[in-house]
Amino acid sequence: MKIGFVSLGCPKNQLDTEVMLHEVLAAGYEITPEDIEADVIIVNTCGFIESAKKEAIDNILDVAWLKKNRHLKAIIVTGCLAERYGESILEEFPEVDAVLGVGSIHNIVEAIEAVTVKKKKGSSQKYYSHEDKNTVRLGGDRVLTTPEYMAYLKIAEGCDNRCAYCAIPSIRGNFRSRPMEDLVAEAKQLESLGVKELVVVAQDITRYGLDLYGKYALSELLHKITEATAIPWIRLLYCYPDKITDELIAEMRDNPRILKYIDLPLQHISDHMLSAMNRHGDRAMICETLAKLRREIPDIVIRTTFIVGFPGETEADFEELCEFVKAQKFEHAGVFPYSREEDTPAYDFPDQIDEQVKQDRMDILMRHQMEINEELNRQKIGTTVDVVCEDYDPVAEVHFGRSAADAPEIDGKVYFKSEHRIAPGSFVKVKVRRVVDYDLFGNIVTKK
């Protein structure tokens, strides 16, 4: 029997897909990358904001068409949308045969067997599993869906921050760290598979260890991983400004294998908005944290995200945010319009902002950030940057990859010419000749 997967959403959800892939293969099923060939398709959904829900629903409908018009026998929905809406998915989408909440991903083989065996017997009974997400076994063997030289390492699950706009705590549960020894062992296993870039993720990686060890232990974890492996690039995503410890800064500064790159979602800078969002800390704390990072790690690259159009955001709040962004000159920044989500405190807030105003503010702030990116990239012309090669484009006759300053999927690319074909996962030095928007173009200098 052939099983197909559709994996949506963030890297953290992608890791859940990888765990399910392993369990499905271990049970003797065949995985097919072609949906049209599949007997069962598993749609692992995102669903924490409106656009993600729409994407998930569109994919479910696409798969439902295959069930109606091809030989697809069953559809299983997992992930955040499944956790959030549960059995109502079975009611809204009669084509769906099974729904598994985020606490039930280890039941995926049972779900496949249930829906396929029952269909053979002529039963139309649905399968639904919604185990306690706060007690589910964390981690598990995986089948990597990333390029072989790069992998994500999820060090925790859930979130305790309770931001007013966010449904993640209700979807993913309370924050739970994975034991340090398990993570070190997983990093060693990933290294044995050829991984050269390890991207550390969780809902809030800087909270790591507080529940298990009574302290923030991210710096200790990173140190142990670099002692136990020789993985050359370790990258940090999803950090919170109020938990950037001196120990973490020192580890990033002094450990050459921890990239001088940090993803630090700030969401806003106006104290009025930070308080309304139930963010931890205020403008003064954020500015001090940024100043300390720049001071202690002068070449650090900071990525952040902002939400515009949150309920009650005034023109003064937005202008303060724009001026802050122009002053800070972040190397990377994403801007998102506020998404009004049920079962979050902000859903019932007064002074909801018009959708067009949200879009206009997003466009304005992104224009500011584009100008900053162009300015910072122009400063790189003539410099040499370390790049991990991702692939070769035979049409353009150039290789492409990412510098240490660019995270997978979300940041820019480096395009470079080479007299010889460079294997994906190889590290090279590239001299930058020109820039276009977020991307760099140059020539290979040496292969590392």
Q: Each predicted region: which residue ranges?
A:
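Conserved SAM/AdoMet-binding glycine-rich loop
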Residues: A74-G79, R84, I89, S192-A316
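Conserved beta-strand core positions
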Residues: I3, V40-I41, A151, L198, ...
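Terminal RNA-binding accessory module
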Residues: D348-K448
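Proteins enriched for Cys/Gly/acidic motifs involved in redox and nucleic-acid/cofactor modification
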Residues: M1-Y208, E247, I262, A284-A291, ...
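Short glycine-enriched, charge-decorated loop/helix-capping segments at active-site entrances
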Residues: G47-F48, R172, L212-K215, S275-G281, ...
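Conserved, mostly hydrophobic/aromatic
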Residues: L183, V200, L236, L264, ...
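Contiguous mid-protein beta-loop-alpha structural module that forms a pocket-lining wall or clamp
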Residues: E313, A327-F330
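Active-site proximal loops enriched in glycine and acidic residues that flank catalytic Cys/His/Asp
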Residues: A202, Y238, L266-H268, T304-V308, ...
